[in-house]
From Swiss-Prot:
Signal peptide: none annotated. Gene3D superfamilies: EF-hand. The lineage of its organism: Eukaryota, Viridiplantae, Streptophyta, Embryophyta, Tracheophyta. This is Calmodulin-like protein 12. It comes from Arabidopsis thaliana (Mouse-ear cress). CDD domains: EFh (cd00051).
Amino acid sequence: MADKLTDDQITEYRESFRLFDKNGDGSITKKELGTMMRSIGEKPTKADLQDLMNEADLDGDGTIDFPEFLCVMAKNQGHDQAPRHTKKTMADKLTDDQITEYRESFRLFDKNGDGSITKKELRTVMFSLGKNRTKADLQDMMNEVDLDGDGTIDFPEFLYLMAKNQGHDQAPRHTKKTMVDYQLTDDQILEFREAFRVFDKNGDGYITVNELRTTMRSLGETQTKAELQDMINEADADGDGTISFSEFVCVMTGKMIDTQSKKETYRVVNQGQGQVQRHTRNDRAGGTNWERDIAVGVASNIIASPISDFMKDRFKDLFEALLS
């Protein structure tokens, strides 16, 4: 059966197979099979993939090896729809720089480092790259590549989506720069995450008007709902009524200054005195108000304007300065 394939076809299939054989054991799962076939221009449905697996997976272990895959591909030659992208596969559409950028952004939001992201994380990754998508768009993207229905996609699947959707993106509303363009260090990202968590009370990855109000009140500030909504709107690039982590970072990095230090200290304006306190992460175990310090300290560190420009160390002034 394999003699029906040309040497070039076998080479292409072998390269794709190796790419998606994650653990290098010489076999792939149904989900990996679907991703691999799309990478070489095929468009199998879930039913098609199940039929292929049933046909090739002779021992019923849920995987197929390369010889089995070659037999399936040879047998099904001439029965597939013409690939949408002619001679080039999806991966060929991306430059090395694009792949590097996508890999960095993917890694940034792969929170547990398992090589996959959820739909919610996909939304954040897309925005960090300056690509705005509706919830319906994101669901369609997930449905297309999440063949096993586990609610996650891996990096090769993500690359496929990026290649397929090139040229269909709107410019980000905030700024021409995206989150990845700022080339933040791991320490800077950690600082942003800690500050973001102060606002994101329920930990769902978004700051709502109510969560913003709660945090502001804890800092001694009271605003009307309209004022709080204005603050949300300034940062809400995709118009969903909330601030995601990437939106939060994009706003704040717009006025970022270099504040890295070997001790990873946080500058905190001492209330009513205008003096600078320094708190390291070791203070977390002490008696300091860590949440307030990290919120104000991180913001203080990344504001381009001098601290003396602020009338108070209240976070209201700080936050409004960020959004101005």
